[in-house]
Amino acid sequence: MKLLSLCSVLLFSLVLLLIPNSPDNVQVQGNHLLVNNSPYYIKGICYHPVPKGQTIRDFQTIDQDLELMKEAGINTIRVYAPIDDIQVLDKIDAAGLKLIVGFGYNQNGVFDILSETYLDYIKKYKDHNAILIWELGNEYNYHPEWFGGDIINWYNALSVATDQIHDIDPNHPVATAHGDMPDKQALASNPNIDIWGLNVYRWDQPQSVFKEWQTVSDKPVYLSEAGADSYMKISKAGFKQGENQRAQAVANAKIIDAVLDRSDVASGIFIFSFTDGLWKAGNPDQQDIGGWAPNSSGVPYDGAPNEEYWGIVDINRNKKETFEVIKNKFLNFLIDKNN
């Protein structure tokens, strides 16, 4: 009898091991993002780790990076291209973080929208627990030249892609990352987008975008990019020219406060970005000033996006002053579940 009981226990345990764990339930309800039927507030970071001296993304520091993210109270990572590495995805999930996966339009046939290979990625990973949202494009509204000079070509492709994802994965919302506020054409062309991401650089006061959003949509919205760099091209607003971590910290504090204060509308914020990107503006072996980004005159406090100075940590993972600011804001914020 004891042997029979032991066999039964072992058999039951084996069955449990063979049954895959169900991923968290992610859905949109009203203007809120829900995970397992509870409001989920994005305390996010944009993440594109390119090592010093290289130009291609590499996850060799993923363990260290995840520890730093957790310390800072970050719960969501936003990447600009799919991560086709189950070990990296498993580590993100094991760390208790969620992931917004971005798909580009034309990435030479690598999980992109043009070739429809992005659907292969979604089919492969749609049941992975790390996945929060599928995100299509990144501020493409600034680049009609990529679509034959007519941005409606992008909006049409976006609409088709949204419907295709809904057909194969009804369990994750579909988003797009739009450069600031979408106009009537963008909204009318994409009625099936579940949640909108907005890349917003309005100095250190992004809150006006939420009032504008409420006048045009009742769908949930998050800031897919916001923040400041740590280099002042000129002296301004009391901040000295040159590398200035204090300016970045002050700006990010005000930006985060402005978003958290509108948690009744905003589903969260992604600070741009986790680490400095030495590959962006010159020699990838050294940190250069300069670089360029569209519609970037609203970058605090000099109106100049020094592209290699955006990290909350530097290339060697040393914490900048803004790290502690973000940590304090994120760890001390709890979503009001009655909103």
Regions found by a protein language model. Name each.
Residues 1-5:
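Positively charged n-region of N-terminal signal peptides that target proteins for export
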Residues 10-25:
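Bacterial Sec-dependent signal peptides at the C-terminal "C-region" and cleavage site
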Residues 28, 34-42, 46-196, 206, ...:
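Active-site mouth of glycoside hydrolases
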Residues 61, 113-117, 153-157, 205, ...:
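Soluble or luminal CAZymes and related metallo-dependent hydrolases
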Residues 72, 124-129, 161-172, 258-266, ...:
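A structural motif corresponding to the C-terminal end of an alpha-helix
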Residues 272-339:
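Aromatic-rich peripheral "rim/lid" segments of glycoside hydrolase catalytic domains that contact
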